[in-house]
Regions:
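Alpha-helical transmembrane segments of multi-pass membrane proteins
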Residues: 94-108, 119, 132-154, 160, ...
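Early transmembrane hairpin of solute transport permeases
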Residues: 57, 63-167, 365
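Long, contiguous bundles of hydrophobic transmembrane helices that form the permeation core
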Residues: 2-11, 167-300, 429-439
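Hydrophobic core segments of alpha-helical transmembrane domains in multi-pass membrane transport
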Residues: 23-37, 64-72, 105-106, 143-153, ...
Length: 464
């Protein structure tokens, strides 16, 4: 019964949801209308705000492109493919694949949100080998597993609160840092981790479609060169018909080995000096060095990177439009206004709920946890401080931590209903197919509704 609802929601999304780029345009126009009618900004001022923000995500967009293609290139190596072949000895039915992909995706995203690319190529390779998998639903499983990143080591808001001299302290919103013991190490966050690790895989298995499968093999519209021509064969075909120094350089081990050794030395130094400090830059570097190590020669790695980068156009040109929306929300004051309205109606009992709703709603216009919290965080924290007036400082800090976590949880769950971060998944999962975000999102409606109810109850009932 529930799986039938998932199919109906999917059909509805296919009929109503436009391409991800059109969705970004519609969000832009919605932000423009809000700034004009609510904030009484002039059209020229709104356009200036849009342009001022338009290029704010260039660095982040480039990081996302690199995390996708360096991660995907690792999956194209013989070593990884042989490892996945061995894995299919133990995981060989669609139900096992759905369960395993959600479980491993949740665990990897707890380490870093960039590790979703590993989940993507693992899921795709399993789908190529195991019959009966509904591939659009498998993509939904991968994306849903991404929810756990806000609970883990790369969660932006808790790390910000624990950073000395952060902008909240500099602007007098906070007078001290909020330790991660109040956020990532809290009872509430540990319970949320348990929800994702133990409940999410079971939930997605229960909601799996019962209709005839749409396998990856059926959905492929172009020949997958990754499976028809090996990287080694292509590298060999590019050699000149006579002995040449250039071919020896292109296909030799020595040059690449030097770079790999240098990279491994730095990676070792990084973790020795900084512990388990995983930001996007070091992850990209690790993926790059590991890819070079697995592919062995410069030419093989060039071919792998070329194959991995064929489907990243969505990230390249859509992220600036989302940055433009962020600019309108930030520079027109619209995001601040929305946060103020929601914070004003909160009480000592309901403030986590309103923080959660704020995080979820504003995320549609500012789909970046750090960028969103820069807009809504000060208003929410000031409201919580007012509600906690007269209480011990430790208790107020706990309230601030709970409100901040609630924003993060709401932001993460609402990601499932908009395609911004799905742009990380589709270049790998949808390569060679005509699949769009609208083919995936319907399968996420029921899981999102279930998690919305459960998460709201948890943030209202559980202590920090």
């Amino acid at each position: 019964m529930l799986s039938k609802f998932g199919e109906k929601f999917t059909l509805g999304f296919q009929k109503l949801m436009p391409d991800a780029f059109v969705f970004a345009i519609l969000l832009t126009l919605a932000a423009v209308m809000g700034a004009y009618f609510i904030m009484d900004r002039s059209p020229l001022a709104i356009i200036n705000s849009w342009y001022d923000g338009f290029f704010d995500l260039l660095a982040f967009g480039m990081q996302i492109v690199l995390i996708i293609i360096t991660g995907y290139s690792i999956a194209l190596s013989n070593t990884v493919k042989m490892g996945i072949d061995r894995l299919t000895r133990f995981i060989n039915t669609p139900i096992q694949v759905y369960f395993f992909v959600v479980c491993i995706g949740v665990l990897l995203s707890l380490i870093s949100f960039g590790f979703i690319v590993i989940t993507c190529f693992l899921a795709r390779e399993l789908a190529m080998r195991i019959k009966g998998i509904n591939y659009p639903f498998l993509i939904a499983c991968v994306y849903f597993s991404f929810n756990s990143w806000v609970l883990g080591l790369s969660s932006t808001i808790p790390l910000l609160l624990n950073t000395s001299d952060n902008y909240l302290i500099e602007n007098g919103v906070l007078d001290q840092v909020i330790p991660t013991a109040y956020t990532l190490g809290s009872t509430l966050n540990m319970a949320m981790i348990g929800l994702l690790v133990f409940v999410a895989p079971v939930l997605m298995v229960l909601l799996r479609p019962k209709t005839p499968s749409k396998s990856l093999e059926e959905l492929l519209t172009t020949t997958d060169e990754n499976n028809t021509t090996t990287i080694q064969a292509e590298a060999q075909a590019l050699k000149l018909p006579f002995n040449a120094v250039s071919d020896r350089l292109n296909n030799g081990l020595f040059l690449q080995a030097i770079i790999v050794i240098m990279g491994l030395v730095y990676i070792g130094m990084h973790f020795y000096n900084k512990g388990l400090d995983l930001d996007l830059n070091i992850m990209i570097f690790i993926f790059l060095i590991l890819g070079m190590l697995l592919h062995k020669t410069p030419m093989r790695y060039v071919i792998a990177m070329k194959r991995a980068s064929t489907n990243v156009s969505g990230v390249l040109f859509q992220y600036p439009f989302y940055a433009g929306i962020m600019g309108i929300m930030l520079y027109s004051g619209l995001g601040q206004k929305m946060a103020d309205v929601l914070a004003a109606v909160a009480t000592i009992e309901t403030y986590p709920f309103y923080a959660y709703i704020t995080g979820g709603l504003i995320n549609f216009a500012i789909p970046s946890a750090g960028g969103e919290f820069a807009v809504v965080g000060p208003s929410i924290i000031e409201a919580v401080k007012a509600l906690g007036a007269g209480l011990p400082a430790a208790e107020v800090n706990g309230m601030i931590a709970k409100a901040s976590l609630s924003v993060a949880y709401g932001e993460s769950l609402s990601n499932m209903m908009q395609p911004f971060f799905l742009l990380l998944v589709m270049p790998i999962m949808a390569a060679g197919t005509t699949l769009k975000a609208r083919d995936i999102m319907g399968y996420l409606v029921l899981p999102v509704l279930v998690f919305f109810v459960v998460q709201v109850l948890m943030i209202l009932v559980l202590p920090i």
